[in-house]
């Protein structure tokens, strides 16, 4: 069974985030995000994450993709024709392969399928990971947007975080 979640970045109160279909628990998506963040030198981490946020353009799932978006998704190997409507006219298919891939955004990926509504789904959004640039923390939520833990972006230790999250 899939463990659905959310990955996003918050700046000046505004979220840019996406739905993640599987392995969203702390030992899956959570660990990937923490490891990816820890690969950025601490001296550069906050500035780099601000740049990433500023570079992201949200696209909506119900929008009709332009040819530019279709070409971009195919060129960047984001398209997955085995899900949903199996069409390049389906935004979910176009951006399926970047779900949960913070590393892709750190490497310049500029489009993100807007999953912000999913964050408020307390039943189906089991875990959420928000890089909060207003507080310079990684905010970890369960059951939608119920904050459970905030950890300084410059002090991320997976084992400590995993142990703290065991009670949730």
Give the location of each predicted region.
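Short acidic-glycine loop/turn motifs at beta-strand connectors
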Residues: 9-14, 132-135
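Short beta-strand scaffold segments in enzyme catalytic cores
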Residues: 4-9, 129
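Extracellular/luminal recognition modules and glycoprotein regions
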Residues: 3, 24-30, 34, 102
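Low-complexity intrinsically disordered segments
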Residues: 40-168
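Short, solvent-exposed aromatic-acidic interface loops
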Residues: 18-28, 145
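Short beta-strand segments
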Residues: 5, 15-20
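Short, basic and Ser/Thr-rich N-terminal targeting/leader segments
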Residues: 1-3, 125
